[in-house]
Amino acid sequence: MPNTVPEALADLPYFVACLGIALFLFTLGLAAYVAVAARRDMRLIAEGNVAAAAGMTGAFIGFALPLASAVIRSEALLGMLVWGGVALLAQLLVLAGLRLMLSSLVRSMRDGQVASGVFLGAVAVSVGILNAACLTY
């Protein structure tokens, strides 16, 4: 147990590095997802499409879950970077595939059907939970 403030803050550089890497990977994953699967959805969100916002919110949470798992399980920054990248790539591939398989739901979400957006968001979160659970290295 640390007895002084400097002792308590000894791990601050590791925290800052860890947070920086996690935010970088999160931003990279979301940018790739938007570029590959959801570019049009961002415009729809800007226009007030609640269904698209619900779907994108699920995707954001779905990306954060496996990344958080990689952060928690990593013993070093390099491991976090590698496994965080693996987790985000897996999430991106699965979500892109699901959007192709569920293309009619994607279309109805883009048409403003909130139920479709909520469902697609829930699928993204569910995939993120499974992805996070599989990071048991």
Which positions does each model-derived feature cover?
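Hydrophobic alpha-helical transmembrane segments
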Residues: 12, 16-20, 80-85, 118-119
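Short alpha-helical packing/oligomerization segments
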Residues: 68-96
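Short, strongly hydrophobic alpha-helical membrane anchors
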Residues: 1-12
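A generic, lipid-embedded transmembrane alpha helix
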Residues: 51-71
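Juxtamembrane boundary at the C-terminal end of a transmembrane helix
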Residues: 130-137
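C-terminal ends of transmembrane helices
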Residues: 30-44, 94-108
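Interfacial loop-to-transmembrane junctions
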Residues: 104-124
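N-terminal signal-anchor/start-transfer transmembrane helix
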Residues: 14-38
